[in-house]
Amino acid sequence: PFVELQPPFNQYEHGSDTEGGYLNMLHYTDWAIGEFIEKFKRRKDFDDTIFMITADHALAHFQSNDPYARFRVPLIVYAPKLIKPHSSQKFGAQTDLLPTIINLLDLEGSYATIGRDLFQPNPGFAVVKDGALVNIFTPQGFLQHSLKQIVDKQLTREDPSGSTQAGLEKKLIAFD
């Protein structure tokens, strides 16, 4: 579903559902975000602004069968006067955006959310629905569940006692 772009954005052979169309769309998106931020820099409130850029889903048909690659979406938090540039491989979900924003804005008061601040040292986890299946991603591994049984799993360490798998399953079912 990628429209053909005009030069200079049509850098790769176009196809409405090909990798070339996807790469052209990324090239255009990168340019558009850069233009937006450059124009925003002229505003008085730029130094106090937090930009959060993310996607609502991964582009699964260009990904491998690796569940980590299939569900990974980028999150860019840009606030040059507030946050030092860095990258993170931390697990998170869109439910974590609100608590992260609240922390970055240093807001006081109480709020209710199921997410957590992504800038806290905790490595986190992400729960992702995939049709009737629910997935959990953590540093301990990945688990996919039908809410009746485990469908797939990839643990990062041997788990002879089954305690890691049981813990992931319990967390996933409690979250759903």
Residue positions per predicted region:
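Solvent-exposed soluble domains appended to multi-pass membrane proteins
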Residues: 1-176
